[in-house]
Amino acid sequence: MHRRRTAIAVSAALVAAPVLTACGETEHPGAAAVVGGERITVAQLEGRVKEVRAAQRAATPDDTQYQQTIARTSGLARDTLHSLVLDRVLDRAARDAGVSVSRRDVEQMRTNLEQQAGGARALQSIWLEQYGVAPRRIDDNLRTEVQAQKLSAALGADMSTTDGKATFWKAMAQASKELNIDLNPRYGTWDVQKSSRVDAKTPWVKEATVAAAPQPA
């Protein structure tokens, strides 16, 4: 089966040391992230998460199975924010490289994938279960897939090789830097070099837990 975001999903372990950015609630109230000066609000993020949860509920009428699905996708909000930010990074990298994606490009990919999956409903089920993508967002998701493929081609980056991956992620890192990405600390920080969200380190939580633990008599 076709893997979502062929280029985006490759390992970024080959890049240099991370540069992390995060924004505080007081700096950008109500923002889950600020990308290129534009806010992704907490309300927008929560709306996207609700779309996925509603689709999961509709696809899983059994309460026990639905609760298992929720437990399995407990990081949905953070994963969704990562995708929202990464889409914008990819847009910038593609624009820098002169890459564009047409509606026809997306339609052609969707048609091919539906044929492989066994129909439109089957594709929706796969994208929801495997990638946490609500049915109404599939075209947006496929656009990023086409965009990533076109970007790698424009860069002359063979994504099956280490050098090709390095070239691709260098362009993504530059785009991340240009966008000056800030994340609300509750969702982690943004690794500029890897173009990826990472969990914020909160050592004080561990320290507080240890301090609160009962001492032996």
Stretches found by the model and what they are:
Residues 1-72, 176-217:
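Short, low-structural-confidence N-terminal segments
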Residues 2-4, 120, 140:
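A generic short-segment signal for beta-strand/edge and adjacent turn/coil regions
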Residues 9, 43, 48, 53, ...:
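Residues in flexible loops and secondary-structure boundaries
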Residues 28-131:
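N-terminal targeting/tethering segments
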Residues 69-96, 123-185:
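Solvent-exposed, amphipathic alpha-helical "stalk/arm" or coiled-coil-like segments used as scaffolds
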Residues 106-112, 142, 185-192:
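Short linear loop/turn motifs
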